[in-house]
Amino acid sequence: MLKGSPHRWLTGPIFDYIQQRGGKLHLRHRVKQVDYSEGESPEITGLQLGTPEGDIRVEADAYLAACDVPGIQKLLPEAWNRYPQFKAIHQLEAVPVATVQLRYDGWVTELGDAQEAQRRDVATPTGLNNLLYTADADFSCFADLALARPEDYRKEGEGSLLQCVLTPGDPWIPKSVDEIVAHTDRQVRELFPSARNLKLTWSNVVKLAQSLY
């Protein structure tokens, strides 16, 4: 797991590293076409980009694409399907996923039944500090971000911030946010009976019909 939010601890430092070495980041630039040479071993000769100022063509010494499954499928030239490795990419199917965040007024994963006072003491974090897995809920993995990544997710006066990943997400994509939150909250309380009396203070749901996985 990252120490905190991806922008602060992953993409941000990568961007800083590139900028410090003279690189530039161009947002709102979309690859419309990959230009390449013909022959048995074609090479990329340039990229046709759509930009806010109009279409442009760029050439480079090297080309690197970091895409999700739908993105790389759109990017690859159709003619490259004659190569098995590129044709195989079109066989991939992205898995739907729903990510649910639930904030409580105490510490959910404190397991001691006799530790009610400790569970309610939001000034003193307690519980399971790790990425967790369960076979007894519809979320395959979860973590208390307030414990595992307090730099970005701990909030004064609040307790646990559970992030739960619902997979497979197919049944959840058409559901309303309220339904998903209620269902996930109920399963959290079933997994941790000692936390049943905690109050859910905030929630958020992100649904991806085509995830990165």
Positions of PLM-derived features:
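C-terminal segments that line or cap access tunnels to active or ligand-binding sites in enzymes
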Residues: 48, 53, 60-62, 67-213
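Helical element adjacent to the flavin cofactor pocket in flavoenzyme catalytic cores
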Residues: 1-62
